[in-house]
Design a protein with these regions (language model features):
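A short, basic N-terminal segment
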Residues: 6-8, 12-62, 294-304
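Walker A/P-loop nucleotide-binding motif
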Residues: 61-82
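C-terminal alpha-helical "lid" subdomain
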Residues: 227-304
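Conserved AAA+ ATPase "SRH/arginine-finger" region at the nucleotide-binding site
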Residues: 96-100, 192, 205-218
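Short regulatory helix/loop adjacent to the ATP-binding pocket of P-loop NTPases
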Residues: 83-86, 188-203
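Conserved NTP-binding/hydrolysis module of P-loop NTPases
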Residues: 30-33, 90-92, 101-120
């Protein structure tokens, strides 16, 4: 802390300066492999193109319940943010990122995001449902779909899932007033196959599972993110480098980002403008030495 009371984070300054010099060395405007989901950097390989088409169809056709699953780090959240950005003037949306709550807490958060109530408003459940129905009817008159996205839906309590299902009863004779997208890890599919969720499963009319990128898509993904960051077509990673990254990451976007970022940092330190497979191998070996292959991957993937 300085004499005038300001807190100084020297480690933060060091990290910022390294990142700044790393970008300057490779002539980039942004960090190409940031772990934060950013729709501007989305790469639509064959699988993600198909997933986006399924989601778009589900919303436009007012299908009600939509299910999207994929492994940790497969790009689900980034894909959804891209969907919302593309349709920001066509739909009203609420994004629930922490579904570990009671139904009333989740419902209040949904209504708050739609500006129907203030969070501290003291209304009974029946009044909340009435207000939500009025809101949905108003949006329906304007032909504006309303969608609620539950991220990490495998964490929703079983009793809460049943109450969420009841919201699908908010409909007219012609259309569903509310669209809901359940996004989660593969466990979500297993949960919804349980007999107790038969009615909910029957209402899911659109479902898609995101699989990892292929080797070819992994290379295209890396080059796409570099170009968005300002590489302008300059090849920084060789084919052998992309092959090594694919072998370690198994095509999981988050792991691709982690290894690619670490490799570019190593390249900056070693003043290597072109990164080959040998450099990637060294970086991967260092990652494995730190925590071991399985624990390393698990730790990185769990930090969504």
């Amino acid at each position: 802390m300085t004499e005038d009371g300001k807190v100084v984070c020297r480690d933060c300054d060091l990290t910022f300066n390294i990142l700044k010099m790393y970008k300057k060395f490779y002539d980039l405007k942004e960090n190409p492999f940031n772990l934060t989901p950013d729709p501007d950097f989305i790469y639509l390989g064959k699988v993600h193109q198909k997933a986006l088409a399924y989601l778009t169809y589900g919303l436009e056709a007012r299908k009600g319940f939509i299910q999207l699953t994929g492994d940790i780090g497969s790009g689900k959240t980034t894909l959804l943010k891209s969907l919302l950005m593309r349709n920001r003037n066509k739909i009203k949306s609420a994004f629930i990122v922490n579904p570990k709550a009671t139904f009333e807490q989740l419902f209040r958060m949904i209504l708050y995001q739609f500006s129907v109530i203030e969070l501290e408003a003291d209304y009974t459940k029946d009044v909340l449902l009435g207000k939500f129905y009025d809101y949905l009817m108003e949006q329906s008159k304007q032909n504006c779909p309303v969608v609620v996205i539950f991220d990490e839906a495998q964490n929703i309590d079983i009793s809460v899932l049943e109450e969420i299902r009841m919201l699908s009863n908010l409909e007219t004779e012609k259309i569903k007033l509310l669209q809901m997208i359940f996004v989660g890890q593969p466990d979500l599919r297993k949960t919804l196959l349980l007999p107790k969720f038969r009615q909910l499963k029957q209402r899911i009319s659109v479902a898609f599972h995101i699989t990892p990128l292929s080797r070819e898509d992994t290379e295209a993904y890396i080059n796409h993110r570099l170009n968005v960051a300002g590489a302008n077509g300059k090849k920084i990673f060789t084919k052998s480098a992309c092959t090594e990254i694919y072998s370690y990451s198994s095509g999981i976007p988050r792991l691709i980002n982690i290894v690619s970022d670490a490799t570019m940092l190593a390249g900056y330190v070693g003043e290597k403008e072109v990164l080959n497979g040998d450099i990637v191998k060294e970086v991967i070996n260092e990652l494995i030495e730190d925590l071991g292959q399985n624990s390393q991957q698990d730790e990185f993937l769990s930090t969504a």
